[in-house]
């Protein structure tokens, strides 16, 4: 299993790209550019809210698991 890092606004790179692609696949309006910007923040916030994930609006271990259904 891959250990995904916790991501927050301002982060950049491959894992942000993967998170954006997963959000896009699930129907959220987000650019896949590898930059955790305000649009990514809004999409992630909506995803977390719709899946009853409490806490900070970061992409953490719980969020990754729900994104990938494992």
Residue ranges of each PLM-predicted region?
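Sec-exported extracytoplasmic/periplasmic mature domains
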Residues: 24-28, 49-53, 64, 68-69
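Acidic, Ser/Thr/Pro/Gly-enriched interdomain connector segments
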Residues: 1-34
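Conserved hydrophobic/aromatic packing and binding residues within compact polymer-binding modules
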Residues: 44
